[in-house]
Curated annotation (Swiss-Prot):
It holds the Pfam family CinA_KH. InterPro entries: CinA, CinA-like_C, CinA_C, CinA_KH, Competence-induced_CinA, MoaB/Mog-like_dom_sf, MoaB/Mog_dom. This is Putative competence-damage inducible protein. It comes from the Bacteria. Transmembrane segments: none annotated. Belongs to the CinA family.
Length: 393
């Protein structure tokens, strides 16, 4: 199904408010398997809204109008849609009863005739009740196009969508199921190049790459009527992806909200191992990230932060083992970021030294990083450290 979102309101065109409804509705439509092809904004003008509806009705199967349902003269959405469809406006009994209760409980407020407009719907519509306000919405199908009318205030729109509209859309629509693969150690452009043949021929399922700080994610999506049906398609696509040019070597986890440090935290908890950390050049960022990822789990024994001149690469093995024994941890991680003298403010060059001490021995790794700001380079150094620990666990 092809959908179009029409935001009605001059305040959107003049930049007085941001159209956050479009982002919310697009995301929810995607979850339902509804393809949103167009976002449109139009002012509070009947003629221009009629022209917009004329265009939308010819290129979309679903037209969602947001805003313009209030009691004032410039709230024209329902009236204009009724004119476009050649129908009348009628009162919805439930919405009118809610309006009655609202004013009955507020005797000091004057009920003017224009308030009644909020309880009107296009004749033949299925009313969409408003849990967070007074203006009723509606849904109607005519000539193969479904028209949906929603309020403009985001709190009302979200409540109406979730409680009134979503159950109706879910009855007949396939849903969009997604799976996120996370990769570290490969850039977005390289990943896209490796997967060019898969990307070029994609239909359903689809895949979309997203560059994050120091890593790349791939979102695999398919439309299906059940999770089981979706898994069959997503499993096949994932297998195809990971067989390309050793991409499995860069893949480390699933999930939109996952991360390298969360992966390390999970493995520490699974193995019931503790870790102590000494870091130089990262400002305590490693310890802060791990503490947050572990929450109240007792697998971070503690650590220390050493100043820029505190650790040189040759001392790391001793530092890692000392911190491990001092804090009685299973693992001791020592990280040192040494800035090279030729660095500039916007082009920091550094050597990152990583050492992990365990009861069975020492593992070490050196990485050259450069071409970034100092803040970004610190984040990358931490990612390298977590990937190093992950591969060692």
């Amino acid at each position: 199904m092809k959908a179009e979102l029409i935001a009605v309101g001059t305040e959107i065109l003049t930049g007085q408010i941001i159209n956050t409804n479009a982002q919310f509705l697009s995301e929810k439509c995607a979850e339902l398997g509804i393809d949103v092809y167009f976002h449109t904004a139009v002012g509070d003008n009947e003629g221009r809204l009629l022209s917009t509806l004329e265009v939308a009705s010819k290129r979309s199967n679903m037209v969602v109008l947001c805003g313009g349902l209030g009691p004032t003269e410039d709230d024209l959405t329902k009236q204009t849609l009724a004119t476009f469809l050649g129908r009348n406006l009628v009162f919805d009994e439930l919405a009118m009863a809610k309006l009655d209760r609202f004013f009955a409980s507020r005797p000091g407020r004057v009920r003017t005739p224009n308030n009644e407009r909020q309880a009107q719907i296009v004749e033949g519509s299925q009313a969409l009740q408003n849990p967070a306000g007074l203006a009723v919405g509606g849904m109607i199908e005519q000539d193969g196009v479904t028209y949906i009318v929603l309020p403009g205030p985001p709190s009302e729109l979200k409540a109406m969508f979730s409680e009134s509209l979503l159950p109706l859309l879910s009855q007949s629509q396939q849903q969009l199921y997604s799976r996120v693969l996370r990769f570290f150690g490969i850039g977005e452009s390289q990943l896209v190049t490796v997967l060019a043949d898969v990307i070029d021929k994609q239909t359903d399922p689809t895949l979309a790459p997203y560059a994050k700080v120091g890593e790349v994610t791939l979102r695999l999506s398919t439309k299906a009527t059940s999770q089981e049906e979706a898994n069959l398609r997503l499993n096949q696509l994932e297998e195809d992806i990971l067989q390309h040019d050793k991409l499995a070597d860069y893949f480390y986890a699933y999930g939109e909200d996952n991360s390298l440090v969360k992966t390390v935290a999970t493995r520490l908890a699974e193995k019931r191992q503790t870790i102590a950390i000494v870091e130089q050049g990262t400002g305590g960022l490693l310890q802060a990230e791990l503490s947050l990822a572990l929450a109240d789990q007792p697998y971070f024994s503690g650590g220390k932060v050493v100043g820029q001149l505190g650790i040189e690469s040759g001392w790391l093995s001793e530092e890692a083992d000392c911190i491990r024994q001092e804090l009685q941890a299973d693992l001791g991680l020592a990280v040192s970021v040494l800035i090279k003298p030729e660095s500039t403010e916007d082009n920091v060059l550094a050597k990152v030294y990583l050492t992990l001490a365990t009861p069975s021995g020492i593992s070490q790794k050196e990485i050259d990083l450069g071409g970034y700001s100092w803040q970004y380079l610190r984040q990358l150094a931490c990612l390298q450290a977590w990937d190093f620990v992950r591969n060692t666990l």
